[in-house]
Protein backbone atom coordinates (compact mmCIF):
# COMPACT_ATOMS: atom_id res chain seq x y z
CA UNK A 1 0.00 0.00 0.00
CA UNK A 2 0.93 3.65 -0.09
CA UNK A 3 0.90 6.48 2.41
CA UNK A 4 0.86 10.24 1.84
UniProtKB/Swiss-Prot annotation:
Ocp-4 has D-Ser instead of L-Ser. The modification D-serine (Ser) is found at residue 2. GO terms for cellular component: extracellular region. The keyword Transcription does not apply. It comes from the Eukaryota. One of its GO terms (molecular function) is hormone activity. It is found in: Secreted. Keywords: D-amino acid, Hormone, Secreted. Cardioactive; has both positive chronotropic and inotropic effects on the heart. Ocp-4 is a 1000 time less active than Ocp-3. This is Cardioactive peptide Ocp-3/Ocp-4. It comes from Callistoctopus minor.
